[in-house]
Amino acid sequence: MNIGAHIPSKNAIDEISYRKGDTFQIFISSPQMWKSPKPREDIEILQDFDGNIYVHAPYLINVATPNNKVRHPSRKLLKDTCKVASTFGAKGVIVHGGSVGEGGDTVSYTHLTLPTNTVV
């Protein structure tokens, strides 16, 4: 069984080692801003970690919305987050799909699957 925690991004390996965990989740950019993550300075340390790393995407992402002014930047931010996460071997990116609002399930399903199929 994997044991882990959502921990601060800075000194993540030291933090999870202190907690005796083998799995952790971090933010790689501010969770409440539209700014894309930058390449990690500690990429080699993260790549050498013998455990599971997950990245939590920013909270602002809403790929389910029919509003293009929100959905399009959400797709870009999700793609950029996945790209940086892949550079150090993250096992996955956790993302909340967002709110559909008006438009129904069919619209939201299309909006949710398009960016994930594009990123993957």
Segments from the language model and where they lie:
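N-terminal pre-domain/capping segments
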Residues: 1-57, 61-80
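Alpha-helix C-cap/termination motif
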Residues: 19, 87-88, 113
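Conserved small/polar residues in nucleotide/adenosyl-binding loops
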Residues: 110-116
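Flexible, active-site-proximal loop/turn residues at the rims of small-molecule/cofactor binding pockets
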Residues: 30, 99, 116
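Hydrophobic alpha-helical segments and helix pairs
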Residues: 78-109
